[in-house]
């Protein structure tokens, strides 16, 4: 089943109704978007799984080194890495059966990788901030 790009608020609302978010590039540094946005999501009831090979602890837990290492079931992969790393992250996501949505934060996009994910039946949201969309659609 070919998934189409996510464009409607109804689709975004449905995605924001999912529970578990693996955050690739999650930061241990307060003040950085890659820390503050996942923190906001955690505070709003999501299970946030930090992925960062260089940090010892984020949000009171040890982060995974990569998406491939995550033992929990993942609904959404939220990407806080440069656009040129998106393709590899999408490859990792497509190796997993559990990932329903790949979401790249503001300023991050790779259309070719997005098309591959959609061809595999995954939903893709590019170049949007999950916190902004949550505030706008869920409150």
Predicted regions located by residue number:
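Short N-terminal or domain-adjacent regulatory/targeting segments
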Residues: 1-17
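Short gly/ser/thr-rich secondary-structure transition/capping motifs
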Residues: 2-7, 58-64
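Conserved beta-strand elements of the Class I
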Residues: 22-23
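A short helix->loop->beta-strand "cap" motif at the edges of active sites that frequently abuts
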Residues: 46, 97-100, 120-122
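Mid-chain, well-packed structural core segment of small domains
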Residues: 67-107
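Rossmann-fold NAD(P)-binding glycine/threonine-rich loop
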Residues: 106-134, 138
């Amino acid at each position: 089943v070919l998934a189409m790009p996510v464009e409607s608020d109804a689709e975004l609302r449905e995605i924001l109704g999912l529970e578990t978010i693996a955050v690739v590039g999650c930061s241990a540094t307060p003040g950085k978007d890659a820390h503050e946005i996942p923190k906001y999501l955690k505070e709003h009831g999501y299970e946030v799984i930090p992925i960062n090979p260089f940090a010892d602890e984020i949000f009171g837990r040890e982060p995974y080194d990569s998406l491939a290492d995550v033992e929990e079931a993942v609904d959404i992969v939220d990407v806080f890495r440069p656009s040129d790393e998106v393709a590899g992250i999408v490859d990792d996501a497509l190796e997993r059966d559990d990932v329903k949505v790949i979401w790249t934060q503001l300023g991050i996009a790779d259309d070719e990788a997005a098309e591959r994910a959609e061809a595999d039946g995954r939903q893709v949201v590019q170049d949007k901030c999950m916190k902004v969309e949550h505030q706008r659609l869920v409150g």
